[in-house]
């Protein structure tokens, strides 16, 4: 996979998400970069499926990542709170987890996702990225200046050649 660069911590987290079969999508600035607009971002945004089963998988992955004690998260139920946003670290290496995004449901975004493989020290791991249609819908619904600017520069042709996975 080309175009996205992740810190070692983020790579380790992606590996653990994969190992635990967490359903998530990379959204936000990193998705914008993937879709062709090279710009700065201070975090990596993960949009996870807000189901009980997936929150348990995510909780287990985070427990492993944090060596048994997740900051501010006591149980999988914390991950299911409506509109939950969990932030770890500081910019430029902050990691955000969210169970909803503006203008797009997880089901809708998952159906149009782009599936990539990220090479991490010990092998290749799947990485799901929000597809261009859902990303554009999300950015339009957010309506902030930076989101509207993103819409001017992302390139649909970048994702059209990538393999889209149907659920």
Per-region residue spans from a language model:
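Compositionally biased terminal segments of proteins
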Residues: 1-167
